[in-house]
Design a protein with these regions (language model features):
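Solvent-exposed alpha-helices and their adjacent loops that cap or buttress functional pockets
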Residues: 24, 105-109, 136, 156-157
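Short, glycine/charge-rich flexible loops or terminal/linker lids adjacent to PRPP-binding catalytic cores
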Residues: 76-114, 122-127, 180-181
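Structural detector of well-ordered beta-strand residues that form the stable sheet scaffold
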Residues: 65-66, 88, 141, 165
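Short glycine-rich phosphate-binding loop at a beta-alpha junction
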Residues: 60-69, 144-145
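Phosphate/pyrophosphate-binding loops at sites that engage ATP/ADP/AMP, CoA/4′-phosphopantetheine
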Residues: 51-63, 130, 134-136
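Active-site-facing substrate-recognition patch
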Residues: 1-58
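PRPP-dependent phosphoribosyltransferase catalytic core
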Residues: 2-12, 131-185
């Protein structure tokens, strides 16, 4: 599947119109439902290959991927299979049972990891994961996402010394049809 076919398949599978409240608290007239492209084996495999290639190109020294729960986990698994890098899962919070870790999977202090994310809007979810990864002693300086909604997330991450590498930008993905999210309230 080439880039144009992948772009078309993502839009066809995931683009919804209506009135949606985003995680950032903003409202939007369109929504890109990540689960509609992450649960399709053909799209997940293609995205895993693209993410693995982006990591090799933009963070070649990374020894591990890191994926925030829930949406980024299938993407990191697909990229891990495609590129051979292991990954850790970043929980929203440590659980009070089992290992009680916020990061699940094997990791070694000082390792360089690359974050994987599905869709970035304001960057808030990724900034929380960056904090967790850094608190665990890992180094993070880049993130690869499937879609950047172009609503300030890349700038927010840059303020935390993390470069965002999107596979697609909303404006390109939707060919100029992007409707900016509006503040909630």
């Amino acid at each position: 599947m080439n880039d144009a076919e992948l772009r078309e398949a993502i839009v066809s599978a995931a683009y919804l119109e209506g009135d949606f409240l985003l995680r950032s608290g903003k409202r939007s007239r369109y929504y890109l439902d990540k689960f509609r492209f992450e649960t399709r084996p053909d799209l997940l495999a293609a995205l895993g290959e693209r993410i693995a290639a982006a990591v090799r190109e933009h963070e070649p020294e990374a020894v591990r991927l890191a994926a925030p729960v829930l949406g980024a986990v299938p993407l990191a698994a697909a990229a891990s299979l495609a590129g051979g890098l292991p990954f850790v899962i970043v929980r929203d919070e440590a659980k009070g049972y089992g290992t009680a870790n916020r990061l699940e999977g094997v990791n070694v202090e000082g390792e360089l990891v690359c974050l994987v994310e599905d869709i970035v809007t304001s960057g808030g979810a990724l900034m929380d994961s960056i904090s967790a990864v850094r608190e665990a002693g890992l180094v993070v300086r880049s993130a690869v996402c499937v879609i950047d909604r172009e609503e300030g997330g890349a700038d927010a991450l840059a303020r935390h010394a993390v470069r965002l590498r999107p596979l697609f930008r909303a404006g390109d993905l939707l060919q100029g049809e992007k409707t900016p999210a509006k503040p909630h309230g």
